[in-house]
A protein has these predicted regions:
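Sec-dependent bacterial lipoprotein signal peptides
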Residues: 1-18
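Ubiquitin-like/PB1-type beta-grasp interaction modules and other compact soluble beta-rich domains
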Residues: 2, 18-124
Length: 124
């Protein structure tokens, strides 16, 4: 009986180790005006940082040593307008170079005014 419990425990660990993490893929979405205009949607491999994923699918201009996105595909920050990003509907609290994507994640960049800190309409 003890051996069966141990085997079941080990099997559960192997199954859980395969969930999410660096396996599978994530989704990258780039929009403007709180999600009203979709500019890009792409699948990306899990395990990349949010910045690596964005740079694989779009032309990105950064500042502050590559930690802050200034422009995506030529759409650049302007007075009172910037790029904001979310992972799974939650606004990021750190640079995209520090956030590693897991399988099933949605990375969403939205170009918008600073007037409302809420997530874009239709956030995942």
């Amino acid at each position: 009986m003890r051996r069966q419990v141990t085997l079941c425990y080990l099997a559960a660990l192997f199954v859980l180790a395969g969930c999410g993490g660096n396996s599978g893929s994530a989704t990258l979405k780039v929009t403007r005006d709180r999600g009203q205009h979709v500019l890009l949607v792409a699948r990306i491999p899990a395990g990349l940082t949010a910045m690596q994923a964005l740079e694989r699918k779009a032309k990105v201009t950064t500042s502050y040593g590559g930690r802050f996105v200034v422009a995506i595909n030529g759409l650049a920050s302007a007075p009172h307008h910037d790029w904001f990003y979310f992972v799974n509907g939650v606004e990021a609290d750190r640079s995209a170079v520090e956030v590693r994507l897991r399988g099933g994640d949605t990375e969403w960049w939205d170009y918008r005014a600073w007037t409302n800190p809420n997530a874009p309409q239709g956030a995942p």
